[in-house]
C-alpha cells in the first residue's frame, strides 16, 4: 500500500522482473522501471522486496509508474504497448513522449521535479529520443496546466 501525492492511497502491484515472461524478451529494459498490465517491475538491480522495504524512497517513481497504470487501464495495455513500443518504427515516438510527459508532469507537480529535468529525461536515450524537445515542452505544458 502506498500513499502517493496526487494519487491518494493506492494498492500497487510491484513484482520482480523475473516473474514477467514478456520482460525476458526485452533485456534492453533491465535498467528501467517498467509497467505492464497494471504490474510495476523495478530495474533488474532492485527487487520488489527492496522497494517495499524502502517505501518512501521510491514514491516519486512509483507515482510516475502509477500514471502508466492508469494510462494502460484507460487504453488497454495491448493498445498502450502498441503505441509505446511498436508504432515508433521507423523513427520518433510521439505517443511514447505523450505518455511520459503525462507521467513526468505528475512528478513535477507533486514531487518538485523541475520541468527542465523532465524534458531532459524524456528527450534522452533512455526513451530512444522519442520527439523533438519543443514538442515535449508543449506536451509537458498541456499536462502541467
Locate the predicted segments by residue.
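Short, surface-exposed, polar/charged, turn-prone segments marking secondary-structure boundaries
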Residues: 41, 69-71, 89
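Short, solvent-exposed loop/turn segments at secondary-structure junctions
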Residues: 40, 47-48, 67, 76, ...
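Metalloprotease/metallohydrolase-associated module, dominated by Zn2+-dependent proteases
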Residues: 4, 23-31, 80-145
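Catalytic Zn2+-binding segment of zinc metalloproteases
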Residues: 65-83
Amino acid at each position: 500500500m502506498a500513499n502517493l501525492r496526487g494519487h491518494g492511497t493506492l494498492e500497487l502491484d510491484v513484482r520482480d522482473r523475473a516473474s514477467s515472461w514478456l520482460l525476458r524478451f526485452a533485456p534492453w529494459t533491465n535498467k528501467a522501471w517498467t509497467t505492464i498490465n497494471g504490474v510495476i517491475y523495478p530495474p533488474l538491480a532492485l527487487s520488489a522486496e527492496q522497494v517495499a522495504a524502502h517505501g518512501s524512497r521510491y514514491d516519486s517513481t512509483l507515482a510516475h509508474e502509477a500514471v502508466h497504470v492508469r494510462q494502460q487501464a484507460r487504453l488497454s495495455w495491448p493498445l498502450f504497448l502498441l503505441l509505446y513500443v511498436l508504432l515508433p518504427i521507423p523513427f520518433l515516438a510521439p505517443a511514447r513522449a505523450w505518455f511520459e510527459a503525462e507521467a513526468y508532469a505528475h512528478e513535477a507537480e507533486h514531487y518538485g521535479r523541475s520541468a527542465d529535468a523532465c524534458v531532459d529525461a524524456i528527450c534522452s536515450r533512455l526513451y530512444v529520443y522519442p520527439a523533438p524537445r519543443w514538442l515535449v515542452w508543449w506536451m509537458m505544458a498541456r499536462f502541467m496546466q
